[in-house]
């Protein structure tokens, strides 16, 4: 998966998980998505994407909440507290 494609995909996962995390009927569907976000957040790919964003290498109009230092962490913390 190319960098922009990956960032867009992960951003969509993050948005969906944030919207649906409080709906307990969706938790079984969210679990693999949360795991995928966690894997990305702890991978060298996330760090490279973040570094490239900070270096101005990504399009300025790209939605990039996934690259914030807290977005995934806050979601994972909330997810853990709900289980």
Report each predicted region and the residues it spans:
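Short, charge-rich amphipathic alpha-helices with coiled-coil/heptad character
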Residues: 1-14
């Amino acid at each position: 998966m190319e960098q922009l494609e990956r960032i867009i995909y992960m951003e969509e996962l993050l948005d969906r998980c944030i919207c649906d995390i409080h709906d307990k009927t969706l938790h079984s569907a969210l679990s693999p998505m949360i795991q995928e976000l966690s894997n990305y957040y702890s991978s060298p790919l996330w760090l490279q994407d973040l570094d490239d964003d900070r270096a101005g290498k990504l399009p300025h109009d790209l939605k990039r909440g996934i690259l914030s230092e807290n977005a995934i962490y806050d979601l994972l913390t909330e997810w853990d507290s709900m289980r």
